[in-house]
UniProtKB/Swiss-Prot annotation:
This is Palmitoyltransferase ZDHHC16. GO terms for biological process: apoptotic process; DNA damage response; eye development; heart development; protein palmitoylation; telencephalon development. InterPro entries: Palmitoyltrfase_DHHC, PFA4/ZDH16/20/ERF2-like. Interacts with ABL1. Interacts with COPS5/JAB1.
């Protein structure tokens, strides 16, 4: 705030000082003298209202950038809608190309068993992608209930001024506290939290599988289409040169029809889009898989990293209190209780709820063993 006032009042103060230095203090008219007095009076009033000895440069910078923060928070909400529409349009375009361009080509070349395998796998993968994306968008991540005093809280949220349970963090875009918040995903236009974290990861995983499947399966078609496009460019160039050398203006008929041209371009588009998404989304999926194996979220990774360094400086070892072991972490995350659940809850669409309520967490075995040993002593 102090920097803003100096920026606005600096030119006016400089003009008044120049007038005083030029000798207008005694010879200035009453009107100018009154302006000088009002300026000084206004400056005193402004300082008496806004001056704060505890405010520094950080406070001034935060106040100056507050409109920018507000603009970003509100614009990102609309960007989320655009990103969701973009995901739907791009996914729909790949499905349309697969039915209109790829399917007629493979029907003439693939055997019946191979066609059956591709038919079942592709539709199974597509169903899982659509199901998990829809669930990730429409399922609330989970919010701590307000007005209850029986919740085990860790701290008080500085934004909401409400009790904040363990693993709960405030989302500045949603302007709410989220249970076991991982991050705010603009591609979902939703926060990723306790109740939709599984849907988010499953969508990333099956979308990566689908992109790898399309990219690998259409490799031969992509090479043929790319070679055909290069041939079309060369033929178009030769055709223009031939027309320019002729004395009569008669365009020769095209060698490739419009449908063939669009088919070749669509196959190239499919391969490049699926390959790029497979690389980018695959890296993100691997990263979240590592975090899930460690029993932490994206936010908790940064918090645990700082805590690990702090304890390491004191000669102590940090252990994540929510790490149940790699396999048990995946069971808790996926909601798997029996061996049959790997099929019915992971490989098939399932809307089962995750373990727990997102506000209280059972301690891992090593914490229970340590507490028992302390009680025994």
């Amino acid at each position: 705030m102090r920097g803003q006032r100096s920026l606005l009042l600096g030119p006016a103060r400089l003009c008044l000082r120049l007038l005083l230095l030029l000798g207008y203090r005694r010879r200035c008219p009453p009107l100018l003298r009154g302006l000088v007095q009002r300026w000084r009076y206004g400056k005193v009033c402004l300082r008496s209202l806004l001056y704060n000895s505890f405010g520094g440069s950080d406070t001034a910078v935060d106040a100056a950038f507050e409109p920018v923060y507000w603009l970003v928070d509100n614009v990102i909400r609309w960007f989320g809608v655009v990103f969701v529409v973009l995901v739907i349009v791009l996914t729909g375009s790949i499905v349309a190309i697969a039915y209109l361009c790829v399917l007629p080509l493979i029907l003439r070349t693939y055997s019946v068993p191979r066609l059956c395998w591709h038919f079942f796998y592709s539709h199974w993968n597509l169903i899982l992608i659509v199901f998990h994306y829809y669930q990730a968008i429409t399922t609330p991540p989970g919010y701590p209930p307000q007005g209850r005093n029986d919740i085990a809280t860790v701290s008080i949220c500085k934004k909401c001024i409400y009790p904040k349970p363990a693993r709960t963090h405030h989302c500045s875009i949603c302007n709410r506290c989220v249970l076991k918040m991982d991050h705010h995903c603009p591609w979902l236009n939703n926060c990723v939290g306790h109740y939709n974290h599984r849907y988010f990861f499953s969508f990333c995983f099956f979308m990566t599988l689908g992109c790898v499947y399309c990219s690998y399966g259409s490799w031969d078609l992509f090479r043929e289409a790319y070679a055909a496009i290069e041939k079309m460019k060369q033929l178009d160039k030769n055709k223009l040169q031939a027309v320019a050398n002729q004395t009569y203006h008669q365009t020769p008929p095209p060698i490739f029809s419009f449908r063939e041209r669009m088919t070749h371009k669509s196959l190239v588009y499919l391969w490049f889009l699926c390959s790029s998404v497979a690389l980018a989304l695959g890296a993100l999926t691997v990263w979240h898989a590592v975090l899930i194996s460690r029993g932490e979220t994206s936010i908790e990774r940064h918090i645990n990293k700082k805590e690990r360094r702090r304890l390491q400086a004191k000669g102590r070892v940090f252990r994540n209190p929510y790490n149940y072991g790699c396999l048990d972490n995946w069971k808790v995350f996926l909601g798997v209780d029996t061996g049959r659940h790997w099929l019915t809850r992971v490989l098939l669409p399932s809307s089962h709820l995750p373990h727990g309520n997102g506000m209280s967490w059972e301690p891992p075995p090593w914490v229970t063993a340590h507490s028992a040993s302390v009680m025994a002593v």
